Regions:
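Flexible glycine-/small-residue-rich
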Residues: 66, 167-169, 206-208, 216
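Flexible, glycine/charged-enriched surface loops at secondary-structure junctions
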Residues: 22-27, 191-202
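Residue-level signature of catalytic and energy-coupling elements of molecular machines
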Residues: 11, 74, 127, 204
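Long, charge-patterned amphipathic alpha-helical coiled-coil/hairpin "stalk" segments used as oligomerization
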Residues: 83-187
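Translation machinery proteins
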Residues: 18-72, 93-97
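A structural signal for small-residue-enriched, beta-sheet-centric alpha/beta enzyme cores
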Residues: 160, 164, 207-212
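Interdomain regulatory linker/hinge segments that flank or connect interaction modules
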Residues: 10-18
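Intrinsically disordered, compositionally biased charged tails
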Residues: 1-6, 216
Length: 216
């Protein structure tokens, strides 16, 4: 790993010292500035989900579209909502409620048999936001899939050579934050044309606090 753990620990310590107390739990965000990448080439743009070692927040909101046994098993977990076919049809006729659901939900999972209906009813809202559901077979281990999605973050590089994503919260142990940050670095190394050489700089910050540079 090109980035030493000590450098990440140092930056985390600095932002926690600099950050003022707020009346809410601040997130910790990683900001990467890239270089020498031609974003006019579609293959160089990034829009994907990265699985972190630890959930970056406690309240990841997951909505599941399912019927039958899959819906029953989903309701036994701590997902945000479980909606069936009738609810989907109702949402299709109410754009206001559809937009509210999409804005309130971090990730969507959907039984494979409902994907076509979802595409017709919610696709125009989900698609532009990058929130199209992950298809789930009716017999899939929904609990395992939900646990995995609670650890996911979306990273995007589209029009500018910079990306920002949440890697945890200010009350997380430093060691957990370090592991999550390293997971992002590892994925970008794999994904960028020249690997780590395409990363110009890295910073971390809390939601409302100043940033601190990670020495690369």
């Amino acid at each position: 790993m090109p980035v030493k753990k000590e450098a990440i620990f140092k930056a985390i310590s600095e932002i926690k010292q600099k950050s003022k107390k707020r009346n809410f739990k601040q997130s910790v965000e990683l900001i990467l500035t890239l270089r020498d990448i031609n974003l006019k080439k579609p293959e160089n743009r990034i829009n994907e989900l990265v699985e972190l070692p630890y959930a970056p927040v406690e309240d990841v909101r997951i909505t599941v579209f399912a019927t039958g046994d899959l819906a029953l098993r989903a309701r036994d977990t701590d997902v945000y909502k479980v909606l069936g076919r009738d609810a989907l049809i109702t949402l299709a006729n109410n754009k206001k409620n559809s937009k509210r659901l999409v804005n309130e939900t971090d990730f969507f999972l959907a039984e494979t048999t409902l994907m076509a209906l979802i595409g017709r009813s919610l696709g125009p809202i989900l698609g532009p936001r990058g929130k199209m559901p992950t298809p789930i077979p009716p017999t899939a281990p929904i609990e395992t899939i939900i646990n995995r999605h609670q650890k996911l973050v979306r990273v995007k590089v589209r029009n500018q050579l910079v990306t920002q994503c949440r890697v945890g919260t200010e009350d997380m142990a430093d060691a957990l934050l370090v592991d999550n940050i390293q997971a992002i670095f590892t994925r970008f190394e794999q994904r960028l044309p020249k690997g780590f050489k395409n990363i110009r700089s890295a910073y971390i910050k809390t939601s409302m606090g100043p940033s601190s540079k990670i020495e690369l």
